[in-house]
Amino acid sequence: MYYFHKFNSFDYHIYVMSISLAVLILILLNIYISFKGFKDIIFFEKFHFNINSIKNGEYYRFISSGFLHVDNQHLLFNMITFYFFGDFVLNALGIFWFYILYIFCLLSGNIFCYLINYSKNNYSAVGASGAVTGILFSAILFYPDLQLALLFFPIPMPGYFFAIIYLAYTFYGIKKQNDGIGHTAHLGGAVGGILLSLFYNPNIVVSSFKTIILMIIVIFIGIVYFKKK
């Protein structure tokens, strides 16, 4: 995923970022723990997200599972996305609240996943997607002029438009549950990112008013769609 900033009506510039130490530390931690999980199945089984294990009191899995990944592609996609948006949020929040946001979104994603899949004792998952999605949505709120583009669809789009498309697809994925993607964690992470960003700086209600209203509308429609038989 690339990010763009619009200079004028016709010109878009792709930034090449230098990475901050705070972002680099989390990326390296994800890489180290994920590769250990790739090589050590006992380690992976002990720390991945599993409904039955959490019911039995292994609550650490809410955090530990967020640093494991299924494979190199899964890890790479999450870390590339985090690389592109991490420094945006770090600059807006400062290092302390940046780390609070990361962990909060990781937790909110996994807790939401736990609640939605509570009856499925064998349900398992891994990945930093909840935290990364929260970082992404926080960046969209703090930088309302941010333009985004997907690697496979390299046409810039406004952040608010990307957000509503992402949320709509996430609800669709939760409803269908047929693609092996942790959409529930994505949604929980996104909501966590929105809420903590608003808590940290309520003024973004004004600067990103349109984005917030559209998000609320999509989430409301998504809840209705999800509950529909």
Task: State what each model feature region is.
Residues 2-229:
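A detector for small-residue-rich transmembrane helices and their helix-helix packing motifs
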